[in-house]
Amino acid sequence: MLFSEAERSLADFAEKHGIPVAETQAGKSAMPIKHPCYMGSIGVTGSSAANALAQEADVVLAIGTRLQDFTTGSRALFRAEGRKIINLNTQAFDAFKHGGLALIADAKAGLAALDKGLGDYAAPGAWQKQAAAMRKTWAAEHAAAT
């Protein structure tokens, strides 16, 4: 994400398609913290919102990540039956991890191609509302602790 300078592309993609976004520790600042689709970090040190959504998602789009144990909670976050993982990565080795669908491309170019392919698709309204509620709960937890 960061090397591709795809931060704006990610935000636009997430907004258009109603997709919540979590970031890895290495991907910090890929999404503005105040963006309504931003759910915080994922993994061992992740937010309650990001980790819960990852556990419930039917499709996970992983962009530029190695999906290592620190990010996946030793795969605990990605065990739901039938879940599909789409790995968008410039490195084939990382793109094929966890039995996902490998999309080998630059993040910015890959997001543009996915956006074109998805057309006007948006995540179901109930999923978007659930993500927004989880974000609100997480933000309140964070505010109370700081």
For each feature predicted by the language model, list its residue ranges.
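Short charge-dense sequence patches
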Residues: E5-R8, D58-Q68, K108-K116
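Short gly/pro/ser/thr-enriched loop/turn and capping motifs at secondary-structure boundaries
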Residues: G27-P32, Q68-D69, A92-F96, L111
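Short amphipathic alpha-helical segments
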Residues: E7-S9, T72-A76, H98-G100, D115
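Short, hinge-like loop/turn segments at secondary-structure boundaries
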Residues: C37-I42, A80, L103-A105
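Phosphate/diphosphate-binding loops
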Residues: G43-D94
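Anionic-ligand anchoring segments at beta-strand to alpha-helix junctions in alpha/beta enzyme folds, i.e.
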Residues: M1-V60
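Aromatic-residue hotspot detector
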Residues: M31, F78-R79, L114
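Phosphate/pyrophosphate-binding active-site segments
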Residues: G82, I86-T146
